[in-house]
Each structure stands twice: as C-alpha cells, then as structure tokens.
Amino acid sequence: MKVRIKFRKQGNMKFIGHLDIMRYFQKVMRRADVDIRYSEGFSPHQIMSFAAPLGVGLTSNGEYMDIEVLSTDDSKTMVRRMNETMVEGMEVVSYRQLDDSSKNAMSIVAAADYTLTFRPGKEPEDLDGFFQKLEAFYHQDQILITKPTKKGERQVDLKPLIYQMYRTEDAVFMQVSTGSSNNIKPELVMEAFYHSLGEEYPPFAMQIQREEVYADLGDENERKLMPLEALGEDIE
C-alpha cells in the first residue's frame, strides 16, 4: 500500500538539512512501529521519498513524503503514533492512502506556496512603499535574470514561473513553479526585485515559510493545481 504523509517543520528544526530529516523519519518509522516496506537486496532500506526538499533555514506547513507499508492502522491512529515520537518543531498532519498506480510525490510536484515575513527590526522604513514597488515589479511583462550555465550565462524570464504574488497583511505571498524542470526559489524572485531597485538583496531580513505543495492535473492550455494531500484518501 502506498501512503502519503504531510508534515510541518517549524522552530529550530528549520536548521536541519534534508538528509538529516530523511534519517530522522527512518527512526520515526521504527519508533512508531510503522510496518514500512523495505527494498530487497544486500542492503535493504525503507521505501521512502520526499516531494521537494526544503532549504535550510526555511520553515514549512506543507512538507510531503511517500512511503509503502505492508499493513496499517487507520489514519488518525497512525498520525497519533508518529506524533508521539516527534521532537518539538516536527508534526505529522495527515496520513493518506494512495492508489497503487499513483506516481510518487517527487515526480509530480509542479508548484508551491510561500509566505515571506520580515524579521523583527528588519522591516523597510516605508513598508507600504515597499509593497507598492513589489506589486509594480510583479506586473511587468517580463522579469529577466541572468543565470550561470556550463556554457556561460543565459537570460531567464521568471514571470511565467511566478503564478501569484501579492501582499497579505505585512507579508508577501508567493506561488511559484516547483519541480525538476522549472524550479524557482522565492529567494531568487526577491533577489531579482531588489536588483530592480538597484539594491542588494538582504538574505536574512525575511523568514520564508512554505505553505503548500501542488501537483498539476491540468493540460498545456490550463493549470489545475491540486495539493498533494488531496490526491490521497484517509484510511478509516
């Protein structure tokens, strides 16, 4: 049986990198007595994959991992059992069964939501003016940046890859393309914005939090974003 787990990563856990998070969940599976499937061969390992690794320093309300299990209790029980083993800052939100034919989360990630909030004392003096400039920046026809490549440099237009960007209270909400083909980090967008103002991007001025990760069930003519969690069903 394929299972998709959604979890939060908060507090000091934001400083723990992806590989250590993976090792952490391997221990969680054992401590919570999850009947996880192991690979075959000389060096068996738990069948486990993550949707989109989160950068160090970012918090999240919407991280995903897929596992395979041989047997399971209901979703509520499994969430409770795993959370009983969790350290502060980590919390399992949901545990949902997938169809046997479902692709793993990593292969279908298409977009992600982020909230960017100024740290105390790091806010611009003119906060309203900052957001007005950000809105004007987003509504440009093109947002060109220069990216280094193996053959030199090339220009990339970020605009088609930023699906939404707007002010929410005193924070920036951003929905961007995510995945193996067109992966845009919110830091890159903000760096381009500050560069357009002739200023240096202050990388530690904002706390960035991922809110959700999506698959795209649409076609080449229209996006139809669906939270990865919605592709599974609770086990009763």
Label each PLM-derived region with a short phrase.
Residues 7-9, 67-73, 116-122, 174-178:
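Short beta-strand-to-loop capping motifs
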Residues 15-19, 72-77, 124-128, 180-184:
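Ordered, soluble secondary-structure elements with a strong preference for glycine-centered loop motifs
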Residues 78-86, 127-138, 189-190:
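Short amphipathic alpha-helices in soluble, non-transmembrane regions
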Residues 6-8, 12, 16, 20, ...:
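Extended, well-folded interaction surfaces typified by the phenylalanyl-tRNA synthetase beta subunit core
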Residues 38-69:
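Short, charge-patterned binding micro-sites
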Residues 61-115:
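Ordered, amphipathic secondary-structure segments that act as subunit-interaction surfaces
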Residues 139-236:
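Core RNA-modification/binding signature centered on pseudouridine synthases
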